[in-house]
């Protein structure tokens, strides 16, 4: 692994009130509760809980602006990204492909190697389509995450909407930058800047090589890199320690089924305070499109300009 360089260590108080409402509250393990058995890594980090049944089981719906709402059986949807998803799992884009194959819509699309994503040329004769989506317990939010990377889950809301050509092309430009960065690094995912802003500490790491750890082997093909691999890779290098916790549900969100980062070094989630994250290009930082409620263990990354984990209280 390339040497990771710690460039900044400062003490900071994070203005959590400014970020109120931007993340689902995470429960934490209290002193009265019994910790589940943990897998301990070589550097002393811990992983609590195991992956359960996560494939979609129930009839889903997709709303396409101007065309109406369509129902689909998740057992009938197949993925076009077999390089990313295992059998039984699929993306938001795959739902559109399924509707096209079922004769319910007319979808023209192609794979763009320069962006590593499928592009919609037209849907029922019209171009420039994007999506609004959120998981159970969430709310509408802007996202610039690749549609064919975004895992579908039970009880999620999925809307396909027209956008301006300028907006769509600005998103596509960041995809090209990621692919160019990936190729320039000989097929390695090397993130120029990884930022951790905890309750008590702030770290900035430069040129972090992020390796796949196959934390979600039931969903993703071996070697697929996700945002949470950033934290695990820093742990492998001895630069941080962490706790990961599997959650079946969180608060009003019945369908979570993901690992969350509960601790980084001495900062551990408590009550309504904990870590959230974002990843992508600086052009779409925070609510511009990079900060959304895709759990970091299911957010596939190519070579984003930055990954940031930060502390909030809601």
Q: Can you name each region flagged by the protein language model?
A:
Residues 16, 20-314:
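Ubiquitin-like/PB1-type beta-grasp interaction modules and other compact soluble beta-rich domains
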Residues 8-17:
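Sec-dependent N-terminal signal peptides
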